[in-house]
């Protein structure tokens, strides 16, 4: 984007924005929750809608002058309904966490019970962690993945639900590399008369493209982020059956938020339209193919993957066996110095702290947006392996950085008519 006016008004911010643009162009984004939106989405999110308050919903606003805002939100809803097939969709949440908050506010009372996946096993802060409002407001018990396989043990989850009797069971995760069997979790919820919240923040795009099974029509509530694998404007979304529509809408506004960020809603609408194009299905499948190629190549280098591989957009690497003296933090910092940006991550059975854990998480959505295929991701895996094998060797880091530079030049950002790399 052109920051000419920002440069005139605020050179310091303009410099930071330019630095971020250059950073994204010149490094490989492998944080599994990140992606590169199109220039069309960027423009929509920087539109004059940022000036407009639009409290309420289309046709029922608390302020005048909301005609264009109504048009934008209605288009976002219509496109979301076409993508995911839910009976009712609210596109106003500012984030995936606030989408989850809306469900809790709508359906639970303080002290009610939540059953969710343990954070170090791949869950999320907003699913009941003590540092989050959920852990401070509700009674939370958490399930874990099988320590031997790294998979969710659905039979064990069912038994745990019967013993705990939760009011809501949360599925959907931030660091779980396998396909989620939503129907199995729904069976556990039905057995104890609990609600089922499926948080698909990481896999919204995979679900929309049909390359991951959908919880819509299975779970009572489906929430997600709109800027990860779906590659739309930043924010959140809530989906539910029509019977819960009024409760959810009231929980979003005025329960959890005031005016929606209408410029972000515009970005959502544009991104949803892009995701309705045939090439998006090819993109989503390529994300998975790339993650599989990345993981398999890392295994060839001797790395251990949680669950032994991946079915989705991410791999979770457990360094304890292959590199017992190298923490996820050391690996993250060495890789960033080489131009590969991923994140340290806890692993099941974690023996270190969350700030210096034993694993790293790597995702392929942003690489795939740049046009990476399986062979390119294998090259990335080779670089990752070499750096982690030699995290303190400056020569290794310099060599890796040169390889990353070559990949960034080979697969530049914002190519093609849609503003992202086109897939034929």
Swiss-Prot record:
Metabolic or biological pathway, per its Swiss-Prot or TrEMBL entry: One-carbon metabolism; tetrahydrofolate interconversion; Amino-acid biosynthesis; glycine biosynthesis; glycine from L-serine: step 1/1
MF annotations from Gene Ontology: glycine hydroxymethyltransferase activity; pyridoxal phosphate binding
Record-marked site positions (Plays an important role in substrate specificity): 227
Subcellular localization: Cytoplasm
Gene Ontology CC annotations of this record: cytoplasm
One Pfam family matching this protein: SHMT
Alphabetized UniProt keyword annotations: Amino-acid biosynthesis, Cytoplasm, One-carbon metabolism, Pyridoxal phosphate, Transferase
Residues that, per the record, bind (6S)-5,6,7,8-tetrahydrofolate: 119, 123-125, 353-355
Positions bearing N6-(pyridoxal phosphate)lysine: 228
Entry EC no(s): 2.1.2.1
Cofactor or coenzyme needed: pyridoxal 5'-phosphate
GO biological process: glycine biosynthetic process from serine; tetrahydrofolate interconversion
Chief subcellular location: cytoplasm
HAMAP family linked to this entry: SHMT
Family: Belongs to the SHMT family.
Protein task: Catalyzes the reversible interconversion of serine and glycine with tetrahydrofolate (THF) serving as the one-carbon carrier. Also exhibits THF-independent aldolase activity toward beta-hydroxyamino acids, producing glycine and aldehydes, via a retro-aldol mechanism.
Description of how the protein assembles with itself and partners: Homodimer.
Protein name in UniProt: Serine hydroxymethyltransferase
Name of the gene encoding the protein in the UniProt record: glyA
